Amino acid sequence: MITVRLKIGDGEIVDTQTFGFIYLDSDKRVGAESKGFESTAYPEEEGEHILPKAADDAFDYKIKFFIQATSLKDANQLITEFNESLHDTPDELGLKTYHQVTFYNDYKRHKIVGYPNEIPEATDFWRDHRNQVEDIVIIEWTIRVTKPSLCDFNLGAE
């Protein structure tokens, strides 16, 4: 089984199986894309003026997991518990402060640092090639990477 680990806020680095999530797949990216050049064009001039400098752009990193559960209710309970671990208790206005997460993909040798989106509730079980319902729910989780320089797409062995 492929090992992927997660650190939420200042917590410990744990295997995602701690949450009942088994890694399936993730983005195929090998780095952040660059932002486009800043440019200015004037009607009375040919072409445009550019500033030939560009920084890395923010991006969404998507990860697929499966959850082995006997019912949708059990799978959604695991999702709810995970989602609640991603943020502090809502304040008096109902605002949640999300923790920064660090996702370590030991298979692809990636370290992704960003802010998590909550995983939506599962609605159906996965079906096999014979259209038989299996006790597996497939979920997709997105991490919003706001500062790509914190990520490492060539992580050394630890």
Task: Annotate each predicted stretch with a short phrase.
Residues 1-158:
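Extracellular/virion structural assembly segments
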